[in-house]
Swiss-Prot record:
Protein's recorded name: S-adenosylmethionine synthase
Catalytic activity: L-methionine + ATP + H2O = S-adenosyl-L-methionine + phosphate + diphosphate
Cofactor: Mg(2+)
Listed InterPro entries: AdoMet_synthase_2_family, AdoMet_synthase_3, S-AdoMet_synthetase_arc
Record's keyword annotation contains ATP-binding: yes
Biological role stated in the UniProt entry: Catalyzes the formation of S-adenosylmethionine from methionine and ATP.
Organism, as annotated: Methanospirillum hungatei JF-1 (strain ATCC 27890 / DSM 864 / NBRC 100397 / JF-1)
Keyword ATP-binding (UniProt): yes
């Protein structure tokens, strides 16, 4: 059955060439990202439990979690937690199948705690955390739509859409690379840098200004001068990384709210502001490509925690992202592409109501030169859409 794939010219200036561009990333320890990460870890754990017990994934969605901030008293050399962080695991899960009970709550609690250990190593889960699981069961109609049939493509759980774009602009590359560098290279050497980091970028013409807010872990900071040195070190390292991503002028500022007195610094006990006053929710942070991009098309769906079998809010956002970048990598002549996939509830997920590609061609190219190759990439991606499910379950695709 042929698919409704449309390709047209987008008559606008590429974002990279516009005068103003804003981009944001909330890194792993930001409360909103903590909520996203827990939601996805719980979903993945449930998927594997269902597969182990029954040979296939059962209905669930764990995309409703909340982080409620605690209270802390950080100080140079190490402070203390006064009130624990509260984590609520919310959503839907299958807890019984063919008369057999499933320990869904137990699986969810373990997955959430295991995830927190990896991203918040300074957090004592026994003393600094309260976690409650309130997973319910799904509505009958959506569970019926979910039911897989042997050899059949899953049916969409909703009438919804996924959207993405490519390629990344210079400032988007800068922010993604700085975040990755801090996680993989800088923090292992300097554990003072907590995982709660937000990077906000402004490109105005040919100048990029990056504002980084980084939670410092107090037990690794002995004094104000020590703190200032670490702050300056982070700015220097971020600038080095940014210069590998762009030829534009780059300015980096770190913790600009600091007053350089002990009581007015971004100093934390655990490396996250969730310990004191900053709550988090699933879906309030990064989109599926890891960024918040107000100059780009975005979906408001929370990708993390949704089931990877037929939940369009997850599958179409991840797939549209892959399709857009694949088109740019494999097809000459694309300055910018936007891909949108729209489902119709109950229809096979490989047959969207429409798959739309809007293209800004490079000079000397036309959409007619490009459209056949783009069509084939989108058609092939939809034909193999269930590979998204498989890679999500294996943890190979990032959702935030």
């Amino acid at each position: 059955m042929s698919r409704n794939i449309t390709i047209e010219m987008l008559n606008q200036i590429p974002v990279q060439d516009q005068q103003i561009e804003l981009v944001e990333r909330k890194c792993l320890g930001h409360p909103d990202s903590i909520a996203d990460g827990i939601a996805e870890a719980v979903s993945r754990a449930l998927c594997n439990t269902y597969i182990d017990q029954f040979g296939g994934v059962l209905h669930h969605n764990t995309d409703q979690g909340e982080i409620v901030a605690g209270e802390s008293m950080p100080k140079f050399g190490g402070g203390k937690i006064i009130k624990p962080i509260f984590v609520l695991l919310d959503g839907r899960a299958t807890k019984e199948f063919n008369g057999e009970k499933i320990a869904a709550d137990t699986v969810a609690l373990k997955a959430a705690k295991d995830y927190l250990r990896t991203i918040l190593p300074e957090l004592n889960l026994d003393q600094h955390l309260i976690m409650d699981c309130r997973l319910g069961t799904g509505s009958t109609d959506l569970r019926d739509v979910f039911k897989p049939e042997a050899g059949q493509i899953p049916r969409a759980n909703d009438t919804s859409f996924g959207v993405s774009y490519a390629p990344f602009s210079d400032i988007e590359k800068c922010i993604r690379e700085i975040s990755s560098y801090i996680d993989t290279t800088l923090r292992p050497k300097y554990p003072v840098y907590g995982t709660d980091i937000k990077i906000m970028g402004l490109r105005q013409g040919n100048t990029i200004k990056l504002t980084i807010c980084c939670a410092m872990v107090d037990r690794y900071v002995s004094s104000l001068s020590d703190y200032v040195n670490y702050r300056e070190k982070l700015a220097e390292e971020a600038l080095k990384v940014a210069k590998t991503c762009t030829d534009k002028k780059v300015e980096v500022s770190v913790n600009t709210a600091d007053c350089d007195i002990e009581c007015s610094l971004f100093l934390t006990v655990t490396g996250t502001s969730a310990e004191m006053g900053d709550d988090g929710s699933v879906g309030r942070g990064n989109r599926a490509n890891g960024l918040i991009t107000p100059h780009r098309p975005m979906s408001m769906e929370a990708t993390s925690g949704k089931n990877p079998i037929n939940h369009i809010g997850k599958i179409y956002n991840l797939l549209s992202n892959e399709l857009a970048h694949t088109c740019v990598e494999k097809v000459d002549g694309i300055a910018e592409i936007q891909v949108r996939l729209l489902s119709q509830i109950g229809s096979p997920i490989d047959q969207p109501l429409v798959a739309s590609a809007q293209i800004i061609p490079k000079p000397s190219f036309t959409v007619k030169d490009i459209e056949r190759d783009v069509y084939e990439i989108i058609d092939s991606g939809l034909e193999n859409i269930t590979s998204v499910t498989e890679r999500v379950i294996r943890g190979e695709l990032k959702t935030f």
